[in-house]
């Protein structure tokens, strides 16, 4: 589907191309032209197997003249978003959510239309590995948030968070121990 729109002084053209690479593996490439901002491309790559699945979305804008003129900064702009889930066995799992952008104005300027992510105040950067059974739960999480709102403050990292739980059930009552240990660091995203 070819899309073309025009505001009072801006022309926006895009043409998506869908590629079915093989069973459970596909990609969409979408070259774009925005008259005030230049040429760019967005893509989405999706994969699915019996033990893992995910999607990678990315966008680049090679020479954003409007951004360069307004902020006197590098005009190469980009975004990246990875979501991955994996099952190692019936009790062990991995989840990765990683998003990043070239600058705090990227989502404000392009929103979710440019790379498949919705407008948000932060880009999540999470790594979670977990193991469960009838008697325990163990979760290791590394967590950070990159603030992508120009007015955003209070970025932090959780390096790491470890949750351990043990529980026992019998006829008359249930009991257990829940614990977690977490270290916080003020700062932004993982670079």
Go through each PLM region and give its residues.
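Outer-membrane beta-barrel proteins and related beta-barrel translocases across Gram-negative bacteria
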Residues: 5-191
């Amino acid at each position: 589907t070819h899309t073309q729109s025009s505001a009072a002084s801006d022309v926006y053209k895009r043409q998506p191309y869908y590629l079915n690479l093989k069973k459970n593996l596909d990609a969409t490439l979408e070259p774009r032209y925005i008259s005030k901002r230049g040429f760019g491309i967005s893509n989405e790559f999706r994969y699915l197997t019996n033990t893992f699945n995910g999607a990678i979305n990315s966008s680049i804008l090679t020479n954003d003249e409007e951004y360069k003129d307004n902020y006197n900064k590098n005009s190469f702009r980009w975004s990246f978003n990875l979501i991955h889930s994996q099952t190692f066995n019936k009790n062990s799992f991995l989840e990765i959510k990683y998003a990043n952008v070239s600058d705090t104005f990227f989502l404000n300027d392009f929103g979710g239309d440019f790379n498949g992510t919705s407008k948000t105040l932060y880009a999540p950067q999470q790594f979670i590995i977990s193991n469960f059974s009838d008697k325990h739960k163990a979760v290791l999480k590394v967590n950070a948030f990159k603030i992508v709102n120009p007015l955003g403050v209070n970025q932090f990292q959780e390096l790491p968070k470890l949750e351990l739980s043990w529980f026992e059930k019998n006829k008359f009552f249930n009991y257990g121990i829940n614990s977690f240990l977490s270290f916080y660091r003020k700062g932004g995203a993982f670079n």
